[in-house]
Regions:
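Perimembrane helix-loop-helix junctions
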Residues: 199-224
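Start-transfer (signal-anchor) and selected internal transmembrane alpha helices
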Residues: 1-26
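Specific aromatic-rich, kink-prone transmembrane helix
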Residues: 152-171, 203-204, 210
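Active-site neighborhood of glycoside hydrolase catalytic domains
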Residues: 181, 189-197, 201
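Active-site lumenal/periplasmic loops and adjacent helix-entry segments of GT-C-fold
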Residues: 23-119, 124-157, 188, 195
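Membrane-interfacial loop-to-transmembrane alpha-helix junctions, especially the N-terminal start
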Residues: 9-13, 122-128, 175-179, 219-223
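Short hydrophobic alpha-helices at membrane interfaces in multi-pass membrane enzymes
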Residues: 164-188, 217-224
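Membrane-interfacial segments
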Residues: 119-124, 169-173, 200, 213-214
Length: 224
């Protein structure tokens, strides 16, 4: 029995690794650098690095910047500290950008699988759902085609909000209190993309209305 569980765990790991490697293929070529938005993202990293090197902790870019992006109003900048700090160690700018995309895609695979596995209680279904989510054309286009990194980050963290809904509707208890999980999910989306946050909030409101008996009655509040 234990050996069967180990073999299932190993097969799940390799399936997820295959999903990650397949979706990350553009990172091993110059395809991920062909988007018209990539220069904007590279200059964004370099600009934040210059500010930090000068001792200025500026988290948001000017709203009316030279690339005409409302970055400060639409995308968070907290997670950009990872490539910025790597850049400050002397790593090449393009390598830092690729590493950032690798981290985003890995987080997407892990969080989507965790949410689907708890929701369906079936590892095979969770693996298939993870592949569909991580290989979705709109997600790959945001990550590689349009280089909309804030949006891609939002889609990476959206499963955390879905995990809250899965546990709240099913009245399941996890290691974290439900209110804390919801707060973490909203905070992650706030620091990623305001557009994806709006999608998440609409989904949250819809579920609160549709599953109002499970979520809003006494037992539902106690679950939170």
């Amino acid at each position: 029995m234990i050996e069967k569980m180990k073999s299932k765990g190993n097969s799940t790991f390799w399936c997820l690794a295959g999903i990650f490697l397949t979706g990350a293929l553009p990172l091993f070529t110059n395809y991920c650098l062909n988007s018209a938005e990539v220069p904007y993202q590279l200059v964004r990293i370099e600009n934040m690095k210059d500010y930090l090197s000068a001792g200025i902790f500026q988290m948001a870019m000017p709203v009316n910047w030279q690339y005409e992006h409302g970055t400060a109003g639409l995308d968070g900048n907290l997670f950009w500290l990872l490539p910025v700090l790597l850049r400050m160690t002397g790593a090449a700018l393009e390598s830092v950008y690729r590493m950032f995309l690798i981290c985003i895609y890995a987080v997407t695979v892990c969080f989507s699988y965790k949410t689907l596995e708890e929701g369906f209680q079936n590892k095979k279904t969770a693996v298939i759902g993870t592949a569909l989510y991580c290989w979705a054309p709109w997600y790959l286009d945001a990550l590689y085609g349009r280089a909309a990194i804030g949006e891609a980050l939002g889609y990476a963290f959206l499963p955390v909000l879905l995990l809250f809904l899965v546990r709240a509707v099913g009245r399941k208890k996890g290691k974290l209190p439900q209110w804390l999980l919801l707060a973490i999910a909203i905070s992650l989306l706030l620091q990623s993309s305001f557009a994806v946050l709006e999608v998440g909030m609409l989904l949250l409101v819809f579920c609160c209305v549709y599953y109002r008996r499970q979520l809003l009655e006494k037992d539902g509040w106690l679950t939170l």
